[in-house]
Amino acid sequence: MDLASRKIVGWSMSERMKADLVCEALKSAYWRRKPAAGLIMHSDRGSQYAGESHRQLIKDYRMIQSMSTRGNCWDNAAMESFFKTLKVERVHQLRYQTRAQAKLDIVNWIEGFYNQRRMHSSIGYQTPVDAERSLMAA
């Protein structure tokens, strides 16, 4: 997530939460955005984020790693809020027949609804795409 616009810029899905999952999500975000060196990559303190493969990828991309304070859920509140929204507004509303169907639907929801049409109070009741445009124009 781009914290300034709340736009979801990279993701990956898997049956298990492993280091390669978060590395794939970071690669997705990196290649879509191609950020300048020094971008802060924030996460919780999960073992996948603290692992060598993820730390090395952050170093290779010349990013700065930031991790939540131990026991402080507020440090990663924006992502926690996104996952709650995804579950409540989409995933728990449907019954998927296959994992492939679920993945396709979730990607379509992120790209077609969440980033494009869902307004957020934290960015002045704009959509993430509109907030990003406003930030780029400033």
Where do the language-model regions lie?
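Charged DNA-binding/catalytic regions of mobile-element recombinases
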Residues: 1-138
